[in-house]
From Swiss-Prot:
Catalytic activity as recorded in UniProt: (S)-4-amino-5-oxopentanoate = 5-aminolevulinate
GO molecular function: glutamate-1-semialdehyde 2,1-aminomutase activity; pyridoxal phosphate binding; transaminase activity
Superkingdom to which the source organism belongs: Bacteria
Compartments, as annotated in UniProt: Cytoplasm
GO cellular component assignments: cytoplasm
Pathway the protein contributes to: Porphyrin-containing compound metabolism; protoporphyrin-IX biosynthesis; 5-aminolevulinate from L-glutamyl-tRNA(Glu): step 2/2
Gene: hemL1
The name this protein goes by in its record: Glutamate-1-semialdehyde 2,1-aminomutase 1
Modified residues (N6-(pyridoxal phosphate)lysine): K268
EC number: 5.4.3.8
Length: 429
């Protein structure tokens, strides 16, 4: 494949946009550098770049495009609303309709508020939890990404009794020291942290299924034990379902496992591809938020008609029979093919799959903790990434990210992808 136009445009982008990208995850720094491919359009499971190359897309905007690019039902709904106005600054009936659909799908959402991103949603749930409990400290799990607000850009201390340190320049140490980070899937470490910090802890923040050091499911009983330990301490459970809501199950990961939090943060997927966020939970807790309570949250774009319309249209597609069974079947076909090719070529690699999403790790370990993902072979992934890109397979440029399937991928797409993997593995010996 030729990337001449992408390379030209990247030089121009470098001149005007800091770092040439508007999110560092779009850079190819983690896969050895080079100009990121500039995309021009998308349709279904495919992307098309400025050089005219076609890709089977497994990035899917890091997960939210579960119905594929430019799904007709969603694009028509958005176009219809755009003709009526994009932003009013007033309440609309669409907000009520969308909130009702979300609450019908997810039983824990007694009350809902819309915001504009997953980062904003998580940030606000933390504020609400602190207001409700009148405590300050937060527990989170190593390797889980919760956006880029100060309180969640915190690296782990040396153990459950140790406070965190800033994971980004510009985050004050005083902020980081309100956060305790423990290993995911390690209930003993979590209990130790709760026992040590006790009534200083406002809430635990958890991705019920990890999406940011690859796809990692909770060990059996882990979420139930987190709930029990947390509630016995008088603290709240916050689920970050920015990636997981509606990705694996219509009612989110919490309804899939039948383990429900006190508060939930949403983003990405629920807007049908438009910028969106939301949070919700028990009425008693949510009533801490203005105008009913003392915890402040506001936003000019929050609940804007375009995002509401896109979200409603998305859920209308996902609530149809057979959607998640189809995604699971495609995911299994891809997983089985990858495992077969790993064996064929004697590649040191393993696969974690959760329904219609998976991660290929270049390691011989089954990944259940962040350290295992971090220690996987980044150089091998970088080589694999570029071999796949040159065959028209678009993956996230990071060893930590998932491959996301959509309702528009086909068995033929999976088979074409596996043919590309076969070649890539043959070049990696």
């Amino acid at each position: 494949m030729k990337f001449t136009e992408s390379e030209k445009l990247q030089k121009l982008s470098d001149e005007y946009i800091l770092g040439g990208v508007n999110s560092p995850s779009r850079s190819y720094k983690a896969v050895g550098g080079g100009a990121p491919v500039m995309m021009r359009s998308g349709k279904g499971a495919y992307l098309y770049d400025v050089d005219g190359n076609k890709y089977i897309d497994y990035l899917q905007a890091y997960g939210p495009i579960i119905t594929g690019h430019a799904h007709p039902h969603i694009t028509e709904a958005i176009q219809e609303q755009a003709a009526l106005g994009i932003l009013y600054g007033t309440p609309t009936e669409l907000e009520i309709e969308f909130a009702k659909k979300l609450r019908d799908a997810i039983p824990s959402l007694e009350k809902i508020r819309f915001v504009n991103s997953g980062t904003e949603a998580v940030m606000t749930t933390i504020r609400v939890a602190r207001a409700y409990t009148k405590r300050n400290k937060i527990v989170k799990f190593a390797g889980q990404y919760h956006g880029h607000s100060d309180l969640v850009l915190v690296a782990a201390g040396s153990g459950p009794s140790q406070l965190g340190s800033p994971d980004s320049a510009g985050v004050p140490l005083s902020v980081a020291q309100e956060v305790i980070t423990v290993p995911y899937n390690d209930i003993d470490a979590y209990k130790e942290a709760i026992d040590y910090w006790g009534d200083e802890i406002a809430a635990v923040l958890v991705e019920p299924i990890v999406g940011n050091f690859g796809m990692v499911e909770p060990k059996q009983g882990f979420l139930e034990q987190v709930n029990e330990i947390t509630h016995n301490n008088g603290s709240l459970v916050i689920y970050d379902e920015v990636i997981t809501a509606f990705r694996f199950h219509y009612g989110g990961a919490q309804d899939l496992y039948k383990v429900y939090p006190d508060l939930t943060a949403f983003g990405k997927i629920i807007g049908g591809g438009l910028p969106i966020g939301g949070y919700g939970g028990k009425q008693e807790i949510m009533e801490q938020v203005a105008p009913l309570g003392p915890a402040y949250q506001a936003g000019t774009m929050a609940g804007n008609p375009l995002s509401m319309k896109g979200g409603i249209a998305l859920l209308e597609v996902l609530e149809q029979d057979g959607v998640y069974e189809q995604l699971d079947a495609l995911g299994k076909r891809l997983e089985d093919g990858l495992l077969s090719l790993i064996n064929k070529h004697n590649i040191t690699a393993t696969v974690n799959r959760v329904y219609g999403a998976l991660t290929l790790y270049f390691t011989n370990e089954t990944v259940v903790h962040y350290d295992q993902a971090e220690n996987s072979d980044g150089e091998a992934f970088a080589k694999f990434f570029k071999l796949m890109l040159n065959q028209g397979i678009n993956l996230a440029p990071s060893k930590f990210e998932a491959w996301f399937l959509t309702t528009e991928h086909t068995e033929e797409d999976i088979d074409s992808t596996l043919k590309a993997v076969d070649y890539a593995f043959s070049q990696m010996k």
